[in-house]
Amino acid sequence: MYNAKTKKKRKNITLGIVYIKSTFNNTIVTFTDMQGNAIAALSAGAIGFKGAKKATPYAAQVIVEKVSEVAKEHGIKTLSIRIQGAGSQRESALRAIFNQNFIVTSITDTSPVAHNGCRPPKKRRV
């Protein structure tokens, strides 16, 4: 049976990767080690923001602050940042990471770029 009060083992990791996925409706922040194993992940809805408040820059800032506390407990000091998406929360999440006194080695934008995929449906005639 799952016991919510059991504490995870503390890993001593110095290098990590932060994934910031910013959509028009939500923001998801994930801290991983260099192999990609997730250490901490949160979204605006998981913290308690509802509806349109999930897509605010303030929500992204709060997410980064909460997730970085867990990352600091695991010993992460140096980060590589990977940003995905086109939401308005990108910049505030980045500023919040810089305010947490991490050493940032690189910032990469991994947003997908369309290369004119499927043909759109025909225009409606009314």
From Swiss-Prot:
SUPFAM superfamilies: Translational machinery components. One of its GO terms (cellular component) is ribosome. Signal peptide: none annotated. It comes from the Bacteria. Gene3D superfamilies: Ribosomal protein S11. InterPro entries: Ribosomal_uS11 (IPR001971), Ribosomal_uS11_bac-type (IPR019981), Ribosomal_uS11_sf (IPR036967). Keywords: Ribonucleoprotein, Ribosomal protein, RNA-binding, rRNA-binding. One of its GO terms (molecular function) is rRNA binding. One of its GO terms (biological process) is translation. Belongs to the universal ribosomal protein uS11 family. PANTHER family: 40S RIBOSOMAL PROTEIN S14/30S RIBOSOMAL PROTEIN S11. Located on the platform of the 30S subunit, it bridges several disparate RNA helices of the 16S rRNA. Forms part of the Shine-Dalgarno cleft in the 70S ribosome. Part of the 30S ribosomal subunit. Interacts with proteins S7 and S18. Binds to IF-3. NCBIfam families: PRK05309.1, uS11_bact. This is Small ribosomal subunit protein uS11. It comes from Orientia tsutsugamushi (strain Boryong) (Rickettsia tsutsugamushi).
